[in-house]
Amino acid sequence: MDLIKEFERLIPEIKKNLEQASSLEHIEQIRVAFLGRKGQLAALMSKIPSVDTSLRPVVGETANSVKNQLTQLIHEYKTQLDFLTTTNRIQNFDAGLPGKRPWYGTLHPITIVLEEICSVFTSLGYTIATGPEVETEYHNFEALGIPSEHPARDMQDTFYISDSILLRTHTSSIQIRTMLKKQPPIAIIAPGRVYRRDSDVTHTPMFHQIEGLVVDKNISMSHLRGTLTAFLKTIFGAEIKIRFRPSFFPFTEPSAEMDISCHPCNNTGYVKNEICRICKGSGWIEILGCGMVHPKVFESVGYDHNIYSGFAFGLGVERIAMLKYHIEDLRIFFENDLRFLRQFM
């Protein structure tokens, strides 16, 4: 009958279409056209109810047979085309070409500088000390001789958790904890995160600091000067110029600040006849604070200042990194921009 012939006609027709298929996508289109819900086979099967009852079993059997053959043909052509595509891809593949290089992770520039600084001091015999970031007022302020009326203890500058608990504003608190637990001689550096309520192009609420402490008999300012000069020349190069100038810190006496010569302007204060933006025309860049440990600090930890003396210093790791890598905006360190971070691979 005519309906059976229409079913059987689908087999040579789909073969013709499959032989012309050039991609797996094209074969999928053919499958939908013949076997889809609105395809040719479905259209013919919708006519079966109108066939004479006695002929329906034969027509139904033919429809199922044709459907199975169509499915098998599609599978065979799809497998064959997939094999040919893979074979061509392999034949055209040049095994001698270099592969695509994946992006490798690397240390953050702050971590690089932090480890470099620690390496310099450990090579000089210092040990690394650590302490809690959530501190007491005693360890963070009082034991260091910072009185209650000092501006640093104001709510505007310090993150307070309670009346006497705060986020440490410097790692000097580690120095206090170390001296309370250990008798001299002491030579430590205390790296870590510290927190202050400040945020602009040169300040962030959280930053990294390294403080150092040396305590022993007959420690003098010359030991401080020699140690820090050697450190700065190792970090920035032997040609760097260094100067000490008087300063004030509650926990050291005498106190000083160290400056290094400004590299962009070569210590002149000017770049192309314009005032240097880095050093503001002075030719010098403040790099760290230091001084001899104040006798009151020794008293607070039970050391006899008539027997022992020592020096302390502190520096910001981000500031060192900014100068070392010529970065003007501190905040870029914390933006996780891969374009920036990949420069340090």
UniProtKB/Swiss-Prot annotation:
Identification of the protein by name: Phenylalanine--tRNA ligase alpha subunit
Class of the enzyme per the UniProt entry, highest EC level: ligase
Signal peptide limits: none
GO cellular component, one term: cytoplasm
Enzyme Commission number(s) of this protein: 6.1.1.20
GO molecular function, one term: phenylalanine-tRNA ligase activity
Cofactor(s) required, per the database record: Mg(2+)
Pfam families with a match to the protein in the record: Phe_tRNA-synt_N (PF02912), tRNA-synt_2d (PF01409)
Subunit (UniProt): Tetramer of two alpha and two beta subunits.
Gene that produces this protein: pheS
UniProt key word Ligase: yes
Localization terms from the record: Cytoplasm
Keyword annotations of the record: Aminoacyl-tRNA synthetase, ATP-binding, Cytoplasm, Ligase, Magnesium, Metal-binding, Nucleotide-binding, Protein biosynthesis
Gene Ontology process terms (BP): phenylalanyl-tRNA aminoacylation
InterPro entries: aa-tRNA-synth_II, aa-tRNA-synth_II/BPL/LPL, Phe-tRNA-synth_IIc_asu, Phe-tRNA_ligase_II_N, Phe_tRNA_ligase_alpha1_bac, Phenylalanyl-tRNA_Synthase, tRNA-bd_arm
Family: Belongs to the class-II aminoacyl-tRNA synthetase family. Phe-tRNA synthetase alpha subunit type 1 subfamily.
Catalytic activity from the UniProt record: tRNA(Phe) + L-phenylalanine + ATP = L-phenylalanyl-tRNA(Phe) + AMP + diphosphate + H(+)
Cofactor note: Binds 2 magnesium ions per tetramer.
Residues that bind Mg(2+): E253
Chief location category: cytoplasm
Disulfide bonds: none
